[in-house]
A protein has these predicted regions:
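Short, intrinsically disordered/low-complexity patches at protein termini
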Residues: 108-109, 290, 386-389, 399-401, ...
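N-terminal signal peptide c-region/cleavage motif recognized by signal peptidases
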Residues: 17-20
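Solvent-exposed N-terminal domain segments of exported/luminal and surface proteins
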Residues: 26-252
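Long, C-terminal catalytic modules of enzymes
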Residues: 416-440
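Hydrophobic helical h-region of N-terminal Sec-dependent signal peptides
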Residues: 9-14
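Gly/Pro-enriched, hydrophobic low-complexity segments
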Residues: 23-24, 29-57, 98, 226-286, ...
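Bacterial N-terminal signal peptides that target proteins for export
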Residues: 1-8
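Extended beta-strand-rich segments in extracellular/periplasmic secretory proteins, especially
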Residues: 181-231, 278-353, 363
Length: 440
């Protein structure tokens, strides 16, 4: 369902200062398909063999998978952890973990990180890969990184030269074309009590991937999201629609809301619709973005057990989600850091994103407050939809370290998993259609 991208994509301007960059040289781009994969990942494994070479990803479903099913069995269900990290040994591994992960291990003795063998399962359609190779020498970032030009559907900058280009890779990465899922969002308070924040139905579309041979135009919608809330009772009947264009400078993102009590659809600021997941880069124009580099990290990966969990309540344990459901692996990530510009205001002074080299998904992020203290931390849970050649990052969650609370959003397992569907009609993507779907 790639929920991170859907809710995340309420993105405003990407006014990223000096991060704009020209295309890479043909000599550099020649590494794609040789030492690099076509999306820019290192094909080789790492020095000690804990990260294997890339061999094309996971394209064969387990024998227990039923063709056409939206619940995907875990292909690694029989594996055992190679390593368990907790507060007692966290200092040995802290350089390979996000700041949030380290803080949780130090704060809660019961918290643990179960590290399993690494599997580079990401697989994309060949046409998307071919487009990504072409983009390396053709795509351009404009307006200080705020917009892009001459991009075919795929990774726009497989060899990124800046923080802005890396973030565009994250935004425009392949996540399927049309997705329909039912989901829950849960809050867990400081006392460890879980409560249902919202239940809903999500339709997500990435229209730029409907025609893989057509370059983006400035006004082309690259992402659109339609949410209808079914619970709890106080939220039932509400709906939200978001649309984001390829050039947010000329065509800013738009959002609409339907409230059943008012019985009308109104346009709202897309900035007003924010969710605390790793992809939420609300007010990106307020930050200077830097591509820090690439790093080997222990991150949530191949989390089929969590993504397709049948009972959400088994996840929502006090202080942190149940470690029994979280699979961690060592992978290489791009580290991208955003620092608040002088004179700008935001609750986050600094943000640090960890982007998977094989998919460009944001696997995690750390957020810091105005005093420079770690404030919140977010995680997305990756699994490869092996029957569809789609890398997915569902669900996602955020820890509020200042309050000792957390939220997990996009829990789809209890509602049948992730469905890749035919597109909705054009008439269903207009604001006027929201009133009909939102009335109780």
């Amino acid at each position: 369902m790639t929920f991170v991208k859907r809710l995340m994509a309420a993105l405003p301007l990407l006014t990223l200062g000096l991060d704009a960059h020209a295309v890479v040289s043909s000599q550099e781009a020649a590494r794609l398909g040789t030492s690099l994969t076509l999306v820019g990942a290192e094909r080789a494994g790492n020095a000690d063999g804990s990260i294997p070479p890339y061999n094309g990803g996971l394209t064969t479903a387990p024998a227990s998978f039923k063709t056409g099913d939206s619940m995907r069995p875990d292909p690694f269900a029989n594996e055992k952890p190679l390593l368990v990290i907790n507060g007692k040994n966290i200092d040995q591994y802290k350089n390979m973990l996000t700041a949030t992960t380290v803080e949780l291990a130090r704060r809660y003795p019961e918290y643990r990180i179960d590290v399993y063998p690494t599997h580079r399962t990401a697989s994309l359609p060949q046409a998307v890969l071919n487009n990504s190779r072409r983009n390396a020498t053709a795509a351009k970032s404009l307006d200080g990184g705020a917009a892009i030009d001459n991009v075919l559907p795929g990774v726009p900058f497989p060899i990124p030269q800046s923080g802005a280009e890396a973030m565009w890779n994250f935004l425009l990465r392949y996540q399927g074309v049309n997705i329909h899922s039912k989901y829950d969002s849960w809050n867990v308070d400081a006392a460890g009590v879980p409560s249902l924040a919202v239940s809903g139905e999500a339709f997500v579309s990435f229209p730029i991937y409907e025609n893989l041979s057509k370059p983006f135009n400035n006004s082309d919608i690259y992402h659109q999201l339609k949410l209808s809330y079914t619970g709890p009772a106080r939220r039932a009947g509400e709906s939200v629609m978001l649309k984001n264009a390829s050039n947010p400078v000329q065509y800013p993102g738009r959002a609409w809301q339907y409230l059943p009590g008012q019985r009308r659809v109104k346009q709202i600021s897309i900035l007003a619709y924010d969710t605390p997941n790793p992809g939420t880069t609300r007010a990106l124009e307020l930050y200077d973005w830097t591509l820090v580099g690439k790093q080997e990290m222990i991150v949530p990966y191949n989390t089929y057990k969590l993504t397709y969990v049948h009972d959400a309540k088994s996840l929502t344990t006090p202080n942190f989600i149940s470690p029994d459901f979280v699979r961690w692996e060592k992978h290489r990530v791009y580290v991208v850091e955003g620092n608040l510009k002088p004179g700008a205001t935001h609750i986050y002074r600094k943000r640090r994103f960890y982007l998977d080299e094989d998919t460009w998904a944001a696997l995690a992020s750390d957020q810091y407050d105005s005093g420079g203290q770690l404030y919140r931390g977010s995680f997305a849970f990756f699994s490869q939809s092996y029957d569809q050649q789609v890398p997915d990052a569902t669900p996602f969650m955020t820890y509020d370290l200042s309050r000792g609370t957390y939220n997990i959003n996009g829990v789809v397992g209890p509602h049948g998993g992730i469905r890749y569907t035919e597109p909705l009609s054009t008439a269903q993507w207009v604001p006027e259609a929201m009133a009909g779907t939102g009335i109780r």
